[in-house]
């Protein structure tokens, strides 16, 4: 029987900075364990002289502490470290492949507040780690066996700073946009969330010819995601009105997700982006197997519009890693999450907010169509999502009344083509409740009942 992972969650290691497991001490151990595991992966060990790991981060203050700790661990195992500084998570994945490194690591807590941080790992090919490798790394951290593995003084690794990593990623992102098109004549608002995309996204858009109004582009280590970015898109939508812009782009802290605003200030989420891009690819025979991969959180309206156009939607559990795994298993090339993680596998190995925005811009420019009109391509089913902060993640079937209420809600909502989804977040102390159906009042009724039952028993 496999031992449960103790520090790896659904997207690497994450928590409050300087509190276990996101401490310098654990980062050092993770660095040592990761260095050893990647150095000895059978597929890589045969063909390499010196081994190397790319190390990037977002703009959090605690990134300095974790960067130095994890790099020290890696170096101590005889593996070189390639520092690339603040760069979007998809940029770290791309540079890992570009530099032919053994692995990539990015220090980020994505959309979380600045006082959280985390550590994500990528394989040599830019995809996220298999569970097996995560288990191997974690077992070395907790078993103590890593303490008995000590390369000699002349075998330790070297640290090198890669100065052109940002430029490499910028050119990679631009390559996802057709050479025959420019963004001349377009005014675009970009909210960078004071995060890792604060240089790359405005730069790419300007180089493609757009007039860019950038905000959330002055990180100070503590303002990442604070009242800005994809978690707080109101500022972006307001600036659309102020500047009479054609489009708004809002990233999260590591720029692996994106939300958009049309020219009227109307917000578009990942489901809207999937509908627009999937239908466009389908119309041009570019959607592999005529299939879009989405999670259980995505709106049922996606199925309706794709099926009407001759396509289909395959669903996975929540998490972009689950989406990517499904895409890899079957060769699909488009997938995403309602939250704004979008994977265009023709260009990227992971969620990339900038590349996703460029694909929508391509469709707008090619068709001469404003985003508000493109967004009318599908009809969203009424959906209500509640996030309940919890003090503990007790199994739902052990809570009084919760299973009964969920079952009753499912019975009523299924009669109108709806559904209920209740789960705990894999990255935050929250229970997430999704209700979907044809009648908003019914959704609100059941959301209130189930949320109240949860708050009484496990609410923070």
Say what each PLM segment does.
Residues 128-130, 214-215, 266-285, 353-362, ...:
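Gly/Ser/Thr-rich active-site loops/lids in small-molecule metabolic enzymes
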Residues 247, 284-460:
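Phosphate-binding and adjacent anionic-ligand microenvironments
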Residues 55-58, 190-192, 262, 346, ...:
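Short glycine-centered, acidic/aromatic-flanked micro-motifs in structured strand/loop junctions
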Residues 2-3, 16, 117-240:
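Gly/Ser/Thr-enriched, mixed-charge loops and adjacent short helices
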Residues 40, 44-46, 52-116, 203-261:
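N-terminal small/polar loop signature for handling phosphorylated ligands or for N-terminal nucleophile
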Residues 91, 135-170, 175, 263-336, ...:
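Proline/glycine-rich low-complexity loops and linkers
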Residues 11, 55, 92, 105, ...:
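Buried hydrophobic positions in well-ordered alpha/beta secondary-structure cores of metabolic enzymes
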Residues 1-72, 76-77, 159-186, 398:
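An N-terminal, well-structured beta->alpha segment
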């Amino acid at each position: 029987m496999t031992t449960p992972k103790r520090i790896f969650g659904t997207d690497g290691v994450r928590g409050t900075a300087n509190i276990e497991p996101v401490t310098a001490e654990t980062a050092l151990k993770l660095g040592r364990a990761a260095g050893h595991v990647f150095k000895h992966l059978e597929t890589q060990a045969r063909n390499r002289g010196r081994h190397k790991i790319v190390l990037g981060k977002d703009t959090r203050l605690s990134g300095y502490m974790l960067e130095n700790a994890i790099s020290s661990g890696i170096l101590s195992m005889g593996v070189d470290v390639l520092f690339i500084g603040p760069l979007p998570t998809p940029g770290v994945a791309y540079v890992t492949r570009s530099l032919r490194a053994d692995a990539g690591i990015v220090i980020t807590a994505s959309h979380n507040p600045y006082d959280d941080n985390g550590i994500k790992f990528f394989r040599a090919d830019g995809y996220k780690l298999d569970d097996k490798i995560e288990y191997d790394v974690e077992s070395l951290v907790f078993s103590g066996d890593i303490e008995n593995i000590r390369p000699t003084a002349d075998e330790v690794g070297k640290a090198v700073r890669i100065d052109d990593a940002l430029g490499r990623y910028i050119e990679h992102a631009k390559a996802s946009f057709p050479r025959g098109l420019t963004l001349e004549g377009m005014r675009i608002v970009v909210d960078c969330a004071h995060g890792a995309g604060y240089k790359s996204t405005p730069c790419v858009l300007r180089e493609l010819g757009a007039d860019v109004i950038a905000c959330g582009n002055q990180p100070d280590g503590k303002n990442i995601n604070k009242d800005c970015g994809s978690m707080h898109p109101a500022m972006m939508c307001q600036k659309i009105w102020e500047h009479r812009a054609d489009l708004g782009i809002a990233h999260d802290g590591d720029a692996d997700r994106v939300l958009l605003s049309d020219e009227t200030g109307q917000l578009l989420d990942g489901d809207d982006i999937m509908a627009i891009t999937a239908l466009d690819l389908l119309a041009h025979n570019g959607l592999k197997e005529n299939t879009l991969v989405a999670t259980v959180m995505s709106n049922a309206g996606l199925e309706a519009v794709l099926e009407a156009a001759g396509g289909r939607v395959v669903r996975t559990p929540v998490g972009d890693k689950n989406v990517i795994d499904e895409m890899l298993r079957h060769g699909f090339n488009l997938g995403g999450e309602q939250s704004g993680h979008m994977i265009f596998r023709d260009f990227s190995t992971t969620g990339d907010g900038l590349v996703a925005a460029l694909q929508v811009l391509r469709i707008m420019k090619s068709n001469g169509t404003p985003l508000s009109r493109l967004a009318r391509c599908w009809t969203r089913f009424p959906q209500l999502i509640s996030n309940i902060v919890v003090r503990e993640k007790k199994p739902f079937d052990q809570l009084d009344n919760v299973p009964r209420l969920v079952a009753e809600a499912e019975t009523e909502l299924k009669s109108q083509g709806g559904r209920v989804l209740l789960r705990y977040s894999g990255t935050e102390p929250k229970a997430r409740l999704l209700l979907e159906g044809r009648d908003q009042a019914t959704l609100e009724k059941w959301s209130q009942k189930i949320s109240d039952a949860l708050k009484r028993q496990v609410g923070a």
